[in-house]
Swiss-Prot record:
GO terms for biological process: lipopolysaccharide biosynthetic process. The gene is lgtE. It comes from Neisseria gonorrhoeae. It is an enzyme of class 2 (transferase). This is Lacto-N-neotetraose biosynthesis glycosyltransferase LgtE. Belongs to the glycosyltransferase 25 family. It holds the Pfam family Glyco_transf_25.
Amino acid sequence: MQNHVISLASAAERRAHIADTFGSRGIPFQFFDALMPSERLEQAMAELVPGLSAHPYLSGVEKACFMSHAVLWEQALDEGLPYIAVFEDDVLLGEGAEQFLAEDTWLEERFDKDSAFIVRLETMFAKVIVRPDKVLNYENRSFPLLESEHCGTAGYIISREAMRFFLDRFAVLPPERIKAVDLMMFTYFFDKEGMPVYQVSPALCTQELHYAKFLSQNSMLGSDLEKDREQGRRHRRSLKVMFDLKRALGKFGREKKKRMERQRQAELEKVYGRRVILFK
């Protein structure tokens, strides 16, 4: 398995955390230097997601987070990789993670590597809807289909066709159709046209900050992105109101799809309920 950990080159503490977390289990990995607000970021947006550059209320750090994933996908496509596992540098790994991440036979036995799919490894401890699927369990973990919003990009496996799908569509999206990258990947805001997202259950990983919150403890690593979002939230709220007025003029065609999706989720919830994806 090609395991890529998105991390700032200067984040010594987090990189030490990753080296210990992955290294102690014999899991191979490589760092991918995260983007930050810079000329390099502007160039990457211009090449891959031009609408993101003009987005009025996503912060520079949020744009950099978005583009770190997008640039990594583009790199994987250039290298001809059939799939990659992507992590962020505050990730915690669960029991037996090496059996999933040190080799990939289990993945190729269960998924068509030439199709578009995502295997979500992470939980955010939110109540979500998952629907049982025919994919066989592996090492006491199941692979139900994720049928509701489940944010976060601390750990996932994405196939070549899924990377191509997102990059092709991101390239032509206007600013008003773009949100944070986790919302594009794991909510119904963005129409993935039937591309399946499988939720590993119990989850194989979680973000350290959210696990600490779940346990009512203090975070040891914190979240730079969460801090940035909090600092800019009030200012961006006023910008968002003006931006949403503009977006409303062109959204009527999409509202029908959203209503249908909400109705579908309501029907699924009646059958399957909502539950927290545990981490172990």
